[in-house]
């Protein structure tokens, strides 16, 4: 089945997984984001191992009852296997590389709109008096030795201080304080690395 016209966002992606047998498990049982949440996923979704590469095509999970974060859900493992990604794109697993090449050759150009964006319905600013990342984001601490809670698929929008060119990159982001995140930048590997180097010089 071709899902490419159906999937518009995370919600519709999860709906496709709900309709695919064995690809999504949802729970309302309370879990602690401190090591417990990832521990449950390790056994349900990853077959009891975190060794790479995992050969188990276990289900993605959605936790609807995260301790300390009422009315917030956490999705984990949505892109954890090539087969699941292929299902979401409506292609065979072996065709993913070709699909990526096709998309790079014929990209969909962005549409600029001045209408209110759905993703901007709720906006939190660091200048808000009660702003606190620890309270706003149900980011899990995956092991007792982790540096802190991690947003594992965080998107970082950055702009070069000289050229004004911008880029969006995906990173694991560690919450360090109520208004600070840290990310690892490998020197020279991405545009954002050059942006950070230049910003550090200023």
How should these model regions be labeled?
Residues 1-202:
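Extended, highly charged
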